[in-house]
UniProtKB/Swiss-Prot annotation:
GO terms for molecular function: rRNA binding; structural constituent of ribosome. Belongs to the bacterial ribosomal protein bL20 family. Binds directly to 23S ribosomal RNA and is necessary for the in vitro assembly process of the 50S ribosomal subunit. It is not involved in the protein synthesizing functions of that subunit. One of its GO terms (biological process) is translation. Keywords: Ribonucleoprotein, Ribosomal protein, RNA-binding, rRNA-binding. The gene is rplT. This is Large ribosomal subunit protein bL20. It comes from the Bacteria. Pfam families: Ribosomal_L20 (PF00453). InterPro entries: Ribosomal_bL20, RIBOSOMAL_L20_CS, Ribosomal_protein_bL20_C.
Length: 118
């Protein structure tokens, strides 16, 4: 059986992991064994949190809309129900942005919803 020399491929594989671990603290950024584990764990966190990010942002938008609607004497749940009844098809992301950056337009929507609900 012929001898296999892996100097180039092994170095390339190690370099890829060490480069991915750049900026990590302690031995995690320069010891291959430890860096490999750290990079794997970082990938797991990244995978998990790409899914969690969607939940977190939705919760943030709901909290912002709730705060803005309460300024106009209405709760979030009543407001969202009124939006559906008034057939206003704006998603939570847009409503949240309007509540912060375009208060008059948001107030107009709230008044329109109040008229529909009442």
């Amino acid at each position: 059986m012929p001898r296999v020399k892996r100097g180039v491929t092994a170095r390339a594989r190690h370099k890829k992991v060490i480069d991915a671990a750049k900026g990590y603290r302690g031995r995690r950024n320069n010891v291959y064994r430890i860096a490999k584990q750290a990079v794997m764990r970082a990938g797991q966190y990244a995978y998990r949190d790409r899914r969690n990010k969607k939940r977190v942002f939705r919760a943030l938008w709901i909290a912002r809309i709730n705060a803005a609607t309460r300024e106009h004497g209405m709760t979030y749940s009543v407001f969202m129900n009124g939006l559906k009844k008034a057939s206003i098809e704006l998603d939570r992301k847009v409503l949240s942005d309007m509540a912060i950056h375009d208060k008059p337009a948001f107030a107009a929507i709230v008044n329109q919803v109040k008229a529909t609900v009442a």
